[in-house]
Amino acid sequence: YATGRSNGVDDLELISGQEAQRLEPALGCDLAMYSPSTGIIDAHALMHALLADAQAHGAVIAVESRFKSAQHLGGRWHCEVLGETITSEILINSAGLDAIAVARRIVGLRPELIPEMFFAKGNYARLMGRCPFTRLIYPVPVPGGLGTHLTIDLGGQASFGPDVEWVPSPTPEQAGKGLEGHFSYQVDESRLTRFEADVRTWWPGLPDRALAPGYAGVRPKLVGPNQPAADYLVQGPKEHGLEGLVNLMGMESPGLTSCLAIAQAVREIV
């Protein structure tokens, strides 16, 4: 609550369990934090809008263009991509799961400034049938994640998740080839039993066998199991001494939600 208020979310309220149940009768809780301005976005539509905006300002998006190396020479970055050299004054490493592998290919970036990366798969379970809630419901966070919370997409489909499933980190050789296709995004049906138990801590009336496997994602994390949570790492010239370089590492959820604020922070650096 205090963190949210200090970050500018000025409509947060702490309410009793009875007040929460007046808003959401199916909810079981003793105390709640009410955030009336919380909502959802269409992730794909947002990305398409950002792409269109970037292209309208002259950006060129080059997909399937593997980055080999970068070196700062003569006041410009020289990036080798698909056997060709691209030069620029600014280089932003925003490669998500591959951000550490990209950082290791930047000449002059000291190894001790490149953190170890951990990976946590987040599985979601899909609700079959009607959802009694009209708001997003978040339980108290758990180590490694936000807890099994309720999300409702723009089509009205309710899902629960993500859980935290730590997956083995790729070897340096695997990371060097890129992580596309490295992880499995299948949701194991055996995890549904745990989902049901977690959801029933705040929705006691969840019907039996009402959940089905949903979707999954993999989060790049700067800390591993049983370690305190870490914030995003935004690393600029003040940290590494390389002009025009910004590294964005550990950009896990809610990175998409905060993408415009992250972009503003990067803009202030460069």
Predicted regions located by residue number:
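Internal hydrophobic alpha-helix adjacent to the cofactor/substrate pocket in enzyme cavities
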Residues: 259-270
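A short, glycine/Asx- and small/polar-enriched loop/turn
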Residues: 22-30, 71-78, 86, 223-229, ...
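General small-molecule cofactor/ligand-binding pocket signal
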Residues: 12-15, 60-62, 212
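FAD-binding beta-loop-beta segment adjacent to the flavin cofactor pocket
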Residues: 26, 208-249, 253, 257
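Dinucleotide-binding Rossmann-like beta1-alpha1 core, especially the glycine-rich loop
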Residues: 1-23, 29, 147-148
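Central helical "cap/lid" subdomain
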Residues: 84-134, 185-189, 267
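Helical element adjacent to the flavin cofactor pocket in flavoenzyme catalytic cores
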Residues: 34-90, 101, 260
